């Protein structure tokens, strides 16, 4: 009897490509999701046993191996669609009760479970190993820690995707007709039967309905524009069709460490001590070896790891306490992990971390030096960085072509110089077709013409792998180029690297040659093996004249390289100002093009802090100013995170961006600036109207964040950020509240925020106020003093003072936020009733948007949702919130109900003790509680003799 009804494959499961995949882009690329719609059976000619048919979200439908021929083409991403649920198990991150789909249980922590979405979104400690439960009844499968593993972006029919009717559509013209598109607004379960199995879609005509995406194995939709559904770790997903018990045995047999592996323990002492119990035990001397590199000596029978640190010292460790250090050598191709927080944690003492390293995350590089302590110097693009080996993963050799194209360009140029040296060293006495390339290199036009007359069919002959046209184009021998073209040289002939003559002209900075080649039909948009156009080559070399020539000849400036970067992406990175100006003026440039990291050109400019690019892009595409990446980050978020203050000013003042825009974690730019301790940016954002009381996903305000990170930002305020830090510190010191207390960055920012109106009693989702996060009583009092100062200033200020002292709330056109406090007391339209009236001023948000009558019942500002603490009229008197007739009626009704309740209570309460209820009734009709009645002979109310006691139940 099968104890687990979900243990086998079922239609409806959601899958991604697996380890044995060999079917190219049938799934539309790695990371795309499909649905199992048919299970193979014995005797079927098209879908035999141990195969399944998958309907991919983007339309393809094909069968795949799930054990057939011993191969497994697919991985199971989600089985919530077939009803898998873990009753009474709560995800300790998102708090959802009854985890749907696979369950992930931490091996290090007591009773800690995650759902698939939280597990794949890097919740909890990445250095902890987990167990995977495919169903509520299956045996657990141990998986390695997520640390250092590559995450793959999940793509398909998810929230935000554009869809049309799909293969199982049976809903008539609900979509508005064949070919009409809709947008997915939500992925949900079908009642209590299944999870994440249907999609709510809003069609172009405005109607919204729910459609199957795996429910009962049906797929009603086809994705035309994919959306991101999160991430997944390929190594941690089960192979579809492989029995869980075999996968469990595989995970047990495949120990994460082998003899000779280089390892480190990177855990805190307290965590390590706790983990060591039952795994070799704890010895205080082990603390000395935390962070040191050791070598795996052997694996014990229990699976623990014996590590040798020097010739004499060996310790036994819990396997989950160790991190394997990849062994790399000069020339190895590596990938930098894409988790910024993990990299920041590993880099101290190993090259350190700088915000300029952020673009390397997830990118591929080459090891150019190995240091004695194991750290690596890695070339990524046109820069090199020192990395902790724990921040790198090995990269497959067959994918080396995806190395940053700028490195390829440099290598190509150096190779060309070598080729030229070889050509020029060859003898030219003999008269043969092979000499054509040599005479072209020597710029001997007469000899080239003579050879072409003798050997007209040899015009494309190669020497050292290059044609005469390619060499002449590189060197700028214009006359030779024209002669070769007149002799019908193949203008788009490629060399071994895929470069054409136009690529060679770009490499050689030959603008005139490029114009001649284009006039003769050279393909300006042809890609070489590194996925680079001639324009990209010219930009990467900084050759302004060639870039200008190619742009004038209408080449496509939007073509990306293998990393999705366009020529303008690279120009921004290299800060080639003239090239940036040229490219941004091209009429058909698309500023919305995203690279593989999801950065459009405005995002990328903000990330790099390129002021010129920001100004140029905003001048032509200001509508992008609040555009978001997949993670919800806007250009202002990126500028705030990376401390690009001048860029932030441009975005706010010239771009008129929304300073309170939130990312997917509900963080505003102000939150990010505080997280990084960027004092100057904090002051800028607050002065430009950032909401100091805005919540993030945890309910934390800016002040919560500043005080939560005060220990991490231990640098004294006056030593931080030069003049900006000193300026803020001086302002705070001038208040007289600080005394001799030394402020670090976090507490100084908190004081500043309190002075600017931040609510010091605001409770987050854990019920903690900012003051609850402070252990130093002196700091608590200082922050209270600054907060009190703000309140006193607001109360004492008159109408004109209020108007003058308001922070400028930055707004965007065509929204109701253009309403502002007028310095002249003239009637203004109320946002609620539309009557002309003198508007009421709200505190602390400073908005004036409604009249006195409409303001009386408001508890929160309808514009910013901040709780109103005070409402002032134009004459600075406070609005009296007198009760309306409706509230008076409600109060009267409440009083009447209270009177009735008291009367009912009196009827059933014992008249003697007035505590207990009447449970015994006498023949006269009165009564008492049982305890009081025992001593009674006459009724205490009517004085009649008690002859009978009747028990009642109230």
UniProtKB/Swiss-Prot annotation:
Keywords: ANK repeat, Cytoplasm, Metal-binding, Notch signaling pathway, Repeat, Transferase, Ubl conjugation pathway, Zinc, Zinc-finger. It is found in: Cytoplasm. Its EC number is 2.3.2.27. Its main location: cytoplasm. This is E3 ubiquitin-protein ligase MIB2. It comes from the Eukaryota. InterPro entries: Ankyrin_rpt, Ankyrin_rpt-contain_sf, MIB1/2_ZZ, Mib_Herc2, Mib_Herc2_sf, SH3_15, Znf_RING, Znf_RING/FYVE/PHD. The keyword Hydrolase does not apply. Zn(2+) 2 binds at residues 106, 109, 124, 128. Zn(2+) 1 binds at residues 91, 94, 115, 118. One of its GO terms (molecular function) is zinc ion binding. A zinc finger (ZZ-type) spans 86-138. It catalyses: S-ubiquitinyl-[E2 ubiquitin-conjugating enzyme]-L-cysteine + [acceptor protein]-L-lysine = [E2 ubiquitin-conjugating enzyme]-L-cysteine + N(6)-ubiquitinyl-[acceptor protein]-L-lysine. Residues 1-80, 149-227 form the MIB/HERC2 domain. One of its GO terms (cellular component) is cytoplasm.
């Amino acid at each position: 009897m099968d104890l687990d009804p979900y243990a086998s494959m079922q239609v409806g499961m959601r899958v991604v490509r697996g380890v044995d995949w060999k079917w190219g882009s049938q799934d539309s690329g790695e990371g795309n999701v499909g649905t199992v719609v048919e299970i193979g059976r014995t005797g079927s000619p098209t879908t035999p046993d141990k195969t399944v048919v998958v309907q991919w979200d983007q339309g393809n439908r094909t069968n795949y191996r799930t054990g057939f021929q011993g191969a497994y083409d697919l991985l199971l991403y989600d089985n919530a669609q077939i009803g898998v649920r873990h009753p009474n198990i709560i995800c300790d991150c998102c708090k959802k009760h009854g985890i749907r789909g696979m369950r992930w249980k931490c091996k290090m922590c007591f009773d800690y479970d995650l759902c698939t979405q939280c597990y794949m979104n890097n919740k909890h400690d990445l250095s902890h190993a987990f167990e995977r439960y495919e169903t509520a009844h299956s045996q657990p499968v141990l998986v390695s820690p997520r640390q250092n593993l590559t995450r793959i972006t999940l793509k398909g029919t998810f929230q935000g995707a554009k869809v049309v009717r799909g293969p199982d559509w049976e809903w008539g013209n609900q979509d508005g007709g064949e070919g009409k598109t809709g947008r997915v607004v939500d992925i949900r379960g079908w009642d209590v039967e299944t999870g994440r199995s249907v999609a709510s879609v809003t069609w172009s005509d405005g109607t919204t309905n729910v459609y199957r995406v795996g429910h009962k194995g049906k797929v009603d939709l086809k994705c035309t524009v994919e959306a991101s559904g999160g991430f997944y770790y390929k190594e941690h997903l089960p192979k579809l069709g492989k029995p869980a018990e075999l996968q469990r045995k595989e995970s047990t047999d495949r120990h994460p460490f082998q003899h000779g592996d280089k390892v480190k323990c990177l855990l805190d002492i307290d965590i390590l001590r706790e983990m060591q119990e039952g795994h070799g035990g704890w010895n205080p001397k082990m603390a000395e070896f935390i962070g040191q590199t050791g070598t795996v000596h052997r694996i014990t029978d229990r699976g623990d790891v014996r590590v040798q640190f020097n010739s004499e010292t060996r310790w036994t460790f819990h396997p989950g306490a160790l991190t394997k250090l990849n062994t790399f050598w000069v020339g190895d191709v590596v990938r930098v992990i894409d988790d910024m927080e993990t990299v920041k944690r590993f880099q101290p003492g190993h090259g350190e971390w700088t915000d300029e390293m952020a673009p390397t995350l997830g990118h591929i590089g080459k090891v150019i030096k190995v240091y004695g302590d194991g750290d690596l110097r890695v070339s990524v693009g046109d820069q090199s960085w020192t990395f902790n080996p724990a921040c790198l993963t090995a990269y497959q050799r067959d994918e080396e072509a995806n190395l940053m194209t700028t490195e390829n360009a440099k290598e190509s140029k150096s190779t060309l110089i070598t080729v030229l040296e070889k050509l020029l060293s060859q003898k030219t006495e003999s008269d043969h077709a092979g000499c054509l390339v040599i005479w072209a290199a020597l710029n001997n036009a007469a000899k080239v013409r003579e050879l072409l007359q003798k050997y007209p069919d040899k015009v494309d002959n190669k020497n050292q792998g290059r044609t005469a046209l390619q060499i002449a184009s590189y060197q700028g021998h214009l006359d030779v180029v024209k002669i070769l073209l007149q002799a019908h040289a193949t203008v788009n002939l490629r060399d071994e690297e895929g470069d054409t003559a136009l690529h060679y002209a770009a490499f050689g900075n030959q603008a005139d040659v490029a114009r001649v080649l284009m006039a003769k039909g050279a393909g300006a948009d042809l890609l070489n093996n590194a996925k680079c156009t001639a324009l990209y080559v010219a930009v990467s070399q900084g050759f302004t004249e060639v870039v200008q020539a190619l742009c004038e000849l209408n080449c496509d400036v939007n073509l990306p390289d293998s990393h999705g970067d366009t020529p303008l992406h690279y120009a921004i990175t290299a800060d080639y100002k003239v090239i940036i100006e040229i490219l941004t003026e091209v009429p058909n440039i698309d500023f919305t093009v995203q690279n593989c990291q999801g950065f459009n050109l405005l995002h990328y400019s903000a990330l790099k802090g390129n002021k010129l690019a920001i100004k140029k892009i905003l001048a032509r595409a200001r509508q992008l100013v609040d555009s978001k990446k997949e993670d919800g980050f806007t250009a202002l978020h990126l500028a705030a995170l990376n401390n690009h203050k001048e860029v932030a000013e441009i975005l706010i003042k010239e771009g008129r961006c929304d300073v309170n825009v939130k990312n997917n974690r509900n963080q505003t730019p102000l939150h990010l600036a505080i997280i990084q301790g960027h004092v100057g940016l904090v002051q800028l954002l607050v002065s430009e109207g950032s909401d100091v009381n805005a919540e993030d996903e945890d309910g934390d305000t800016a002040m919560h964040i500043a005080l939560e990170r005060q220990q991490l930002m231990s640098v004294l305020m006056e030593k931080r950020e030069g003049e900006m830090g000193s300026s803020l510190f001086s302002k705070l010191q001038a208040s007289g509240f600080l005394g001799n207390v030394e402020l670090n960055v976090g507490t100084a920012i908190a004081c500043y925020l309190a002075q600017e109106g931040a609510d010091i009693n605001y409770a987050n989702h854990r019920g903690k106020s900012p003051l609850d996060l402070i252990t130093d009583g002196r700091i608590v009092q200082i922050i209270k003093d600054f907060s009190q100062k703000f309140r006193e200033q607001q109360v004492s200020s008159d109408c004109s003072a209020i108007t003058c002292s308001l922070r400028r709330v930055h707004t965007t056109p065509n929204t109701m936020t253009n309403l502002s406090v007028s310095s002249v007391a003239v009637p203004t339209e109320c946002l609620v009733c539309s009557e002309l009236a003198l508007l009421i001023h709200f505190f602390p948000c400073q908005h004036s948007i409604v009249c006195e009558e409409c303001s009386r019942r408001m508890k929160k500002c309808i514009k910013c949702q901040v709780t109103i603490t005070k409402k002032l009229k134009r004459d600075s008197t406070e609005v009296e919130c007198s009760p309306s007739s409706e509230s008076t009626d409600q109060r009267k009704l409440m009083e009447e109900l209270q009177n009735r309740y008291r009367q009912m209570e009196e009827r059933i309460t014992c008249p003697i003790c007035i505590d207990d209820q009447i449970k015994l009734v006498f023949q006269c009709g009165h009564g008492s509680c049982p305890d009081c009645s025992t001593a009674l002979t006459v009724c205490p109310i009517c004085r009649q003799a008690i002859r009978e006691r009747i028990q009642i139940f109230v």
